[in-house]
């Protein structure tokens, strides 16, 4: 399909022994580079890593040889109970040590570098003593992992917590970025005159997110950019204009960086 540079799947949707889903994925992987995106490792959780889950993930990686694997800075399991969500972590030294240890173990078992994604958040913790960007930088420094810059997550969190998304992008360590995500978000009314933004992946990408993508590419150079659409998915033909817009932004950055070099 013209305009499709690579595809990405949620790894947990394909952790079965066989069946049509894996056969279809074999066909996709023959045509396009494949990226795996995890949603359940619970890297920020206090529980030990689920080694059975990691084993299934390793089998998937060995079968499809993805160009990258990414996971979220979040937790989803506690005391053996799995919560079907990506929940926020406290940015303190204890969490940093725990996340770094979990990433190191994950990378050793999988035999590949992990890309850690900045989260979308809806609450903050008074006890946090690290800034999010600095926390991500330090985690990468300690583990050798890369980063996945989710531009929509930046926009969502910045709106919800009242800071500048452009300043966040400006401070981000772009040399560590292996992939960029963009997506749509939902705006839900809360108190009178206020809204909370939700990382919904079921609506078109907003102009504010497109502008942040342009900023990120200008600062860090071309990177693989994924258009995420998990809900209310339209026909592929309806998404092609967005893919063309991504390609144009990457092409312009190639020229700009060639001139600067």
Predicted features and spans:
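Active-site acidic/histidine proton-transfer and metal-coordination neighborhood
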Residues: 50-147
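Gly/Pro-rich active-site loop or hairpin
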Residues: 18, 48, 86-90, 96, ...
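Flexible glycine/acidic-rich beta-alpha junction loops that bind and position SAM and/or redox cofactors
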Residues: 75-81, 124, 152-159, 181-200, ...
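Acidic (Asp/Glu)-rich catalytic clusters
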Residues: 1-2, 18-36, 52-67, 105-109, ...
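Conserved, mostly hydrophobic/aromatic
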Residues: 7, 69, 114, 150, ...
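N-terminal ordered "arm"
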Residues: 1-15
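C-terminal helical cap(s) of enzyme catalytic domains, especially alpha/beta-barrels
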Residues: 236-258
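Acidic-and-aromatic substrate-binding clefts and catalytic sites of carbohydrate-active enzymes
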Residues: 11-23, 42-52, 122-129, 155-162, ...
């Amino acid at each position: 399909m013209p305009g499709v540079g690579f595809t990405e799947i949620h790894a947990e949707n394909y952790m079965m022994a066989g069946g049509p889903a894996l056969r279809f994925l074999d066909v996709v992987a023959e045509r396009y580079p494949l990226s795996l995106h995890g949603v359940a490792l619970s890297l920020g959780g206090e529980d030990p890593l689920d080694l059975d889950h990691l084993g299934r993930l390793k089998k998937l990686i060995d079968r499809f040889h993805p160009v990258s694997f990414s996971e979220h800075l979040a937790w989803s399991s506690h005391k053996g109970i799995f919560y079907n969500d990506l929940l926020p972590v406290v940015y303190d030294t204890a969490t940093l040590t725990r996340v770094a240890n979990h990433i190191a173990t994950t990378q050793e078992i999988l035999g590949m570098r992990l890309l850690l994604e900045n989260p979308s958040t809806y609450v903050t913790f008074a006890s946090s003593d690290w800034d999010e960007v600095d926390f991500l930088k330090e985690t990468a420094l300690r583990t050798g992992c890369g980063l996945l810059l989710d531009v929509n997550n930046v926009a969502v969190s910045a709106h919800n917590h009242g800071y500048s998304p452009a300043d966040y992008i400006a401070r981000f360590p772009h040399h560590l970025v292996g992939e960029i995500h963009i997506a749509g978000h939902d705006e839900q009314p809360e108190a009178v005159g206020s809204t909370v933004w939700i990382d919904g992946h079921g609506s078109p990408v907003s102009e504010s997110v497109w502008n942040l993508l342009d900023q990120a590419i200008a600062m860090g150079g071309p990177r693989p950019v994924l258009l995420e659409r998990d809900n209310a998915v339209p026909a592929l033909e309806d998404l092609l204009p967005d893919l063309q817009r991504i390609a144009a932004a990457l092409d312009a950055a190639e020229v700009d960086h060639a001139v600067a070099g």
